[in-house]
């Protein structure tokens, strides 16, 4: 069927209707402002804190956007006008299908949803509440908005309907099967789990487990160079994830890179908590983790000191352990590297919104003495921070379209969650996110001594990621003022994981350098120089500047006191969280 374009007279008549509508809207706006006492917005006698003034402003904006929306929709449907222009967030792929733009029905649904979303966000932004409450409101409103997206429902998603027609409903049958499987697992499947196996194509850098206790295994990696650094490197990964994020595979491994640069690399593999260790505390994690590992590494290598690297929560644990050593006047560290680590929890980003006094008190009452925080709960919490990408995307693809997830190593790692002992978790959340005690000298007692981070007098390399939603980079920047040693701060592009795992050979992303750490974070960034590619070579050069010389590479792993136990990656990393 051919649609005849409207005549010039019809378009002129349509325009007159539009003008009349705008005039009517203006009259309504004036009447509303008169009732609210805010006719002159510049001379608003009620002030910005007035609920009436707030409602009046919101009503004006609602009707303004409604008019623009229906104007564009009418022109598109009946007058051959241009498509309405909705502003999508960067990276929003929910409405990428052409039907959302080309078909008036779906465009109308999409535009209505986006308009309603914007109004909800505006309402929160204008709410007269304290900053913490506003951030919480913004977070929970976003959860609601994300959940109610028309792309999440089969009747309003053109891709789902098209797929069902093309497959004669087989996609819906497959989706139901996927849903049942995930209900049995207790989590959403986001990756083809059959494509990966720890020890086969993940965590494959050659090495040997040379020590273990009920909490950790310690891996010594096989040297790949004839000479190695005299001072060994101990890596402390986060205890809330499996360590192999740092050893994803050949060419995509920070561990492999460090070994190739001649470092003597040791790494802690944390055990996922089981009932037998559900009583372990924060102090146990320090004593049985990095403090014990440092002594084992020193005995095996004969070195007086070790370089230490901590990632995320592993960096927080390492820093506290270093402060314990400083308090006991035990000079066992040569340098520290902290990757996306928070020590000052003044600004914790969105994850801090999920940890309040009530939630911590509840955990303390239930698992504070003994018990387990399941890894699935931690994984779901982190997933809500990016619900569209980590939850709803897979609800649509797996359950509505019946698709099988792709093979992606990072998502496999992200799904391989770790459980924590209740006492350790409760101490950590109360003294970091809730009360921010660690940064204050002497405010916490750990391993029997008062902890003062400023007593850590070793050079420290600080890395943050510019788009990190878990450790805001400006929070990581403040660590330079807490640790007593000379600091170097580097800012990587991208987020919490991709900013860290960026092998030089891929020549991707960038990082920022500025030796002047005196300004505030924003001042530092504005004066920083952007460098293309990975930050890894900069870290390697920094490590070389703090080298104590090289020695012939050892030909055997372990020592008579700590003989080899089993090949890397060991048993602990393969254990699944219940």
Predicted regions and their residues:
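Alpha/beta-hydrolase fold nucleophile elbow
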Residues: 294-314
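Amphipathic, low-complexity, repeat-rich surface-exposed segments
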Residues: 1-216, 228-229, 266, 479, ...
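Short beta-strand/loop motif that positions the catalytic acidic residue
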Residues: 456, 462-464, 468
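Alpha/beta-hydrolase active-site loop
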Residues: 277-301
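Short beta-strand element of the alpha/beta-hydrolase
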Residues: 228-239
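Short amphipathic alpha-helix adjacent to the substrate-entry channel of hydrolases
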Residues: 247-265
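Alpha/beta-hydrolase-fold enzymes
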Residues: 129-162, 299, 303, 317, ...
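Short alpha-helix in the alpha/beta-hydrolase fold that links the catalytic acid
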Residues: 472-482, 493
């Amino acid at each position: 069927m051919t649609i005849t374009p409207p005549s010039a007279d019809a378009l002129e008549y349509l325009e007159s209707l539009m003008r009349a509508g705008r005039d009517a809207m203006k009259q309504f706006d004036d009447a509303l402002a008169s009732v609210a006492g805010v006719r002159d917005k510049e001379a608003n006698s009620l002030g910005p804190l007035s609920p009436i003034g707030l409602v009046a402003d919101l009503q004006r904006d609602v009707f303004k956007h409604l008019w623009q929306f229906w104007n564009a929709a009418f022109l598109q449907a009946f007058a051959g006008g241009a498509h309405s222009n909705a502003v999508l967030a960067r990276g929003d792929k929910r409405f990428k299908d052409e039907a959302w733009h080309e078909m008036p029905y779906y465009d109308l649904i999409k535009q209505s949803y986006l308009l309603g979303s914007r109004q909800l966000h505006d309402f929160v932004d204008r709410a007269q509440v304290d900053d913490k409450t506003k951030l919480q409101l913004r977070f929970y409103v976003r959860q609601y908005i994300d959940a109610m997206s028309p792309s999440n429902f089969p009747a309003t998603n053109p891709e789902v309907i098209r797929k069902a027609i093309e497959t004669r409903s087989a996609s819906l049958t497959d989706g139901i099967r996927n849903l049942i499987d995930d209900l049995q697992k207790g989590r959403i499947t986001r990756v083809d789990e059959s494509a990966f196996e720890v020890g086969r194509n993940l965590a494959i850098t050659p090495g040997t487990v040379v020590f273990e206790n009920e909490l950790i295994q310690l891996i010594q990696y096989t040297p790949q160079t004839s000479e190695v650094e005299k001072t060994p490197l101990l890596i402390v990964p986060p205890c809330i994830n499996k360590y192999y994020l740092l050893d994803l595979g050949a060419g995509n491994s920070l561990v492999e890179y460090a070994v190739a640069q001649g470092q003597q690399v040791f790494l802690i593999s944390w055990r996922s908590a089981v009932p037998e260790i559900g009583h372990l505390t924060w102090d146990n994690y320090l004593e049985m983790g990095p403090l014990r590992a440092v002594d084992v590494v020193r005995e095996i290598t004969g070195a007086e000191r070790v370089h230490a690297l901590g990632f995320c929560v592993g960096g927080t644990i390492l820093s506290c352990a270093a402060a314990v050593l400083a308090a006991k006047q035990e000079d066992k560290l040569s340098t520290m590297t902290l990757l996306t680590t928070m020590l000052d929890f003044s600004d914790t980003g969105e994850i801090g919104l999920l940890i309040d006094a009530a939630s911590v008190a509840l955990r303390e009452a239930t698992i504070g003495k003994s018990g387990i925080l399941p890894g699935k709960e931690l994984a779901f919490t982190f997933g809500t921070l990016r619900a569209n990408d980590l939850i709803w995307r897979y609800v649509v693809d797996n359950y509505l379209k019946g698709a099988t997830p792709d093979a992606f190593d990072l998502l496999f790692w992200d799904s391989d969650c770790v459980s924590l002992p209740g006492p350790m978790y409760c101490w950590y959340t109360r003294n970091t996110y809730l009360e921010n005690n660690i940064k204050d000298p002497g405010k916490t007692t750990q391993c029997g001594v008062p902890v003062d981070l400023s007593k850590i007098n070793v050079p420290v390399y600080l890395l943050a990621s510019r788009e990190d939603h878990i450790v805001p980079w400006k929070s990581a920047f403040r660590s330079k003022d807490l640790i007593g040693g000379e600091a170097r701060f580097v800012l990587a592009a991208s987020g919490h994981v991709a900013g860290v795992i960026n092998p030089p050979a891929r020549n991707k992303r960038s990082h920022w350098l500025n030796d002047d750490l005196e300004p505030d974070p924003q001042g530092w960034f504005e004066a920083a120089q952007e460098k293309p590619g990975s930050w890894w070579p900069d870290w390697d050069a920094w490590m070389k500047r703090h080298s104590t010389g090289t020695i012939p590479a050892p030909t055997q792993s372990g020592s008579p006191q700590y003989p080899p136990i089993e090949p890397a990656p060991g048993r602990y990393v393969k254990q699944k969280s219940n």
